[in-house]
A protein has these predicted regions:
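Membrane-embedded alpha-helices and immediately adjacent juxtamembrane helical segments
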Residues: 1-317
């Protein structure tokens, strides 16, 4: 039995410890900043709320043995909502008395446009993170397939949560859903990138995203009911909407960060396989790259603020 060569040992050590290097952390922050991570998360959260809440209402209207009142009560029971939070959920999902709950062709078409818009926002995330050419509407077929996968994953997720967990902390169900979540995330990136990301490069995103989102969802089960009830008690349905968008924003920050980290993990593993050694001034280079991205974002923000001020000053005249 031959001993492992020094090169093999070095490669193993680098594979296991690269994420501890400051340069890798700086590269990840630069990638997150390059895709405008927080702005992207806000856009995704808004798109998700615009698309998914109407989709839930539509499903309660067309699926047999499911109505909006039952769906609202299920959410209330699942998260232990009381008081203003419970009333806000009922007002948000349940139709008013005497209201026709039928689904029109125009309404269904508008809903599909909203869901497609959300899927394209996710598509732009993967295109920018992995530096791919933007396809926009040319990837519509894959977007539609992904929407079907999203509905299926949501149904499976809801079913597992319903039969496994009874309290607010859904630790067991989130652990059981890890394989399904990883598979869905890999499928999401593969479809929305028009299958341009190699499957091997999707593994870090699928695994990391599934783990981080499971941690977030477990914590959300604790703080979300308090946030929801507090906002709804103060501001009614508007407060419930703000709470939902806040929760979705945090969810999307985790998703965007997972994509940025996973992309850098894939690149780093590729460099290790090729035997490339990090340069001596790697930390300085990555720090300068991060500062350049921050300066660019600050300059863009200042230009937007100056344009806003000039517009209002001309309007006042």
């Amino acid at each position: 039995m031959t001993a492992a060569s020094p090169v093999d040992r070095e490669r193993v050590v680098r594979t296991l410890t690269f994420w501890l290097r400051p340069a890798f952390v700086l590269r990840t922050l630069t990638r997150f900043q390059r895709v405008a991570g927080f702005d992207r998360a806000i856009a995704l959260a808004s798109g998700a709320f615009t698309a998914l809440v109407p989709l839930a209402i539509l499903l309660t209207a067309i699926l047999p043995r499911i109505d909006a009142t039952h769906a609202a009560q299920t959410i209330i029971n699942r998260y232990g909502l009381t008081g203003g939070g419970a009333e806000a959920v009922k007002d948000l999902l349940s139709p008013a008395g005497g209201t026709d709950t039928g689904v029109s062709v125009v309404g269904a078409a508008l809903l599909m446009i909203a869901v497609l818009s959300f899927s394209r926002a996710l598509q732009r995330l993967f295109e920018q993170t992995w530096e791919l050419k933007q396809l926009s509407v040319r990837n519509t077929v894959n977007n539609l397939i992904w929407i079907g996968a999203l509905v299926a994953y949501t149904a499976v997720s809801w079913w597992i949560h319903a039969i496994v967990d009874r309290g607010r902390v859904h630790l067991a169900s989130n652990l059981l859903l890890l394989p399904a979540s990883a598979t869905f995330l890999a499928l999401t990136a593969w479809l929305l990138s028009a299958k341009r990301i190699a499957r091997a490069r999707l593994a870090p995103f699928a695994i990391l995203g599934a783990v981080l989102l499971a941690i977030y969802l477990t914590g959300a089960g604790v703080y979300l009911p308090h946030l929801f009830s507090s906002y709804a008690s103060r501001y009614g349905v508007i407060g419930a909407v703000l709470a939902m968008i806040s929760a979705l924003f945090a969810f999307m920050v985790v998703l965007v960060a997972s994509a940025a980290i996973a992309c850098e993990v894939s690149d780093e593993l590729d460099r290790i396989r090729r035997g490339e050694r990090p340069p001596d001034d790697e930390i300085r280079r990555e720090w300068e790259a991060l500062l350049d991205e921050l300066r660019l974002r600050w300059q863009t923000l200042r230009e937007q603020l100056d344009g806003y001020r000039n517009k209002h000053s001309q309007h006042d005249r």
